[in-house]
Amino acid sequence: MLAAASRTTMLGIPDSGQLVAALTGLGEEDEHIRDAGRVGTPHTYGSFLPIYGDLPPLSVTVVQETLPLPEGGDHPVPPKKTIDVAPLLPEHADQPVVTNNSATTRPQLCAPYDDDIEATLRAMETNPAERPSPYFLETTQGGRMTALVRASMIAFMDEFSRFYELADGTLQRAAYFLDRYLSVTPESDDVLQLRLVGATAVFLAAKYEDQYTLRKIDASMVAARCGYTSETRHKMVSCMETEILAALDYNLSGPTASTFVQHFTRYYGDGKEEELLKEAAHRFTDGSLLTYGFHRYLPSVVAASAIFLARLHVLGHEPWSRDLAELTGYEAIDLMGCVCDMYSQIACPRFAPFQVCEHVPDSSHVSADHEEVESSLQFVSAEHGNPAG
């Protein structure tokens, strides 16, 4: 145990003690939070906005030519007219607008829409019609599919999406489609059929995320990737698309964890550290797809937990702040269950976020260090429970 702890310290990996302190201590954060290392919104958005300046009121002079005098008349020439025109831009147009429910350090560039988008995403993620069944493997599938088989499908879907370099967010949405489909449709254990379901879910998700997907891949290529070689293989993909769409009731727009990661980091800049944080958060959310049970958490909870661990991984300190709590709607203590479950799936937190899902997790290959991490996180209350199926 001590040797493992020493190795953890030498590698710079945050131990469970740091995780406990981060989760339990940040709820009492005072006004003396260090600004150094905080990744929040820029203090000013001046460099990101066009510099319009304050334009003075415009004055347009309309000059009318002198009209010839009519015969027998003596009319005066019409005088010059000055028309006052309102400024093209309001004063201080280069200043961002901040609404009442926003942190003062977080400017909103689209104030009339930002709050509406937030409310819409929150409503959609809690809509039962747009959520997978909590225990679809035990109920709908009736034991015909195990958590390991589902993980194998996710791994195949990940490899499929990376092979064709499909749009970001495709894997998250494809897994969302898959879980909703399996929640209402009993599936066989035929390998080719399962591959067809997974690949078609990726195909649908890719077309949803990127309108130019068909320039990269078509139905015949999807079927061939699954192992089908007949001349009419594209029809199998089309039929499966129709079946999945019907199972989803043609509702494809539910937010995923990836959606909320993008939403919560929308004020990040283009700095190296901020890009690293976003990449790590996306890798954490993608890694959670392999474990059956994370779908029971709301996507916003999974996204916020991934950002928490990404900040702990990249910054090494201050994984949460008042601005993040206000932005996400979650205090650090609210994320305890999901953070600990996500943390327990990572054998080496320092490097795991940058390893793509290339294998199916097998409990027989869990390292001794990983077991020690799991045992050290037993402070989690029973109500949070490990979602792993």
From Swiss-Prot:
Family: Belongs to the cyclin family. Cyclin F subfamily.
GO terms classed as biological process: cell division; G1/S transition of mitotic cell cycle
Name recorded for this polypeptide: Putative cyclin-F1-3
Keyword tRNA processing among record annotations: no
GO molecular function: cyclin-dependent protein serine/threonine kinase regulator activity
Keyword Plastid part of the UniProt annotation: no
GO cellular component terms, semicolon-separated: cyclin-dependent protein kinase holoenzyme complex; cytoplasm; nucleus
Classification via SUPFAM superfamilies: Cyclin-like
Annotated TM spans: none
Pfam families according to UniProt: Cyclin_C, Cyclin_N
SMART domains tied to this protein: CYCLIN, Cyclin_C
Keyword tags: Cell cycle, Cell division, Cyclin
